[in-house]
Amino acid sequence: MIRLETEHPVAIESPDHIAPVGTVDDNTTDIDYINAVKNHFNNEQIRVLDLGCAGGQLIADFISRGDIGVGLEGSTNARERGAGKHNWDEYGDKNLFTVDLSKPYQLYEDDEKMKFDFITTWEVVEHIAEEDLRVFFEQIRNHLKDDGVFCCSISVVPDDVGWVDGKFLRRHQSVFNSVKWINLLFDCGFELAYDPSWPPTPVGIQYPHHPGIPEGVAARPQGLFFGYLFGDAMFRMHTTYGNSIFFCLKKKV
């Protein structure tokens, strides 16, 4: 049995809860992406964690492949009226849970702390306020196996809600360039998990906190890729045309 322990079951201050869009509309999955992840792990059973899972279809599809999947979502709107409500009806409080991802939490499986082979979060990180990012990444590091992979995409364009009840809301609360992101990720205990067989295209950017020039960096029409392990397979959460940065990371040794 899987259970979640937290004092913050809902991200009540998040613009994505107050003025929901993705948490209600999104229930995206991608079989090519799942296949690429499975191939990377030699098609063995893996433990997968999806942060900002919305309707939970990605996790439902991993589970249907025989994997152990958990999805975490910040807003109850996904469960109550989202596009993936049927997944929440089936997997809610078993594989899908709500939690404020910017606060401490711990997942357990049969009362043992869970560790995951693969943690993924697409177009979610930029929704976390800058002052909460270190706690956000600390939870990921705590739940990642020592040889696990953390994969994310981060949008670099603004997304403003506007004025709601006298307060200006901004969905994308952390919009930085690749230099700031990679320095922050290294400072939070991650390093690139690149595939040496993937030919990089150097982008000529300096990363002061990184020892030497990062390897496995490529510039493509969709955006900048850092250590990306899955070739052309990208989870189709959003259509991106140079608007995102993609990272595949592992724990820093």
Can you annotate each of these PLM segments?
Residues C151, P196-V253:
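A C-terminal cap/extension of S-adenosyl-L-methionine-dependent methyltransferases
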Residues E123-H127:
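Short catalytic micro-motifs in class I SAM-dependent methyltransferases
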Residues A129-L133, V161-G162:
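Short N-terminal helix/helix-N-cap motif within the alpha/beta-hydrolase-1
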Residues Q173-G189:
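Short alpha-helix
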Residues C152-Q173:
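Short, glycine-/aromatic-enriched active-site segment of Class I SAM-dependent methyltransferases
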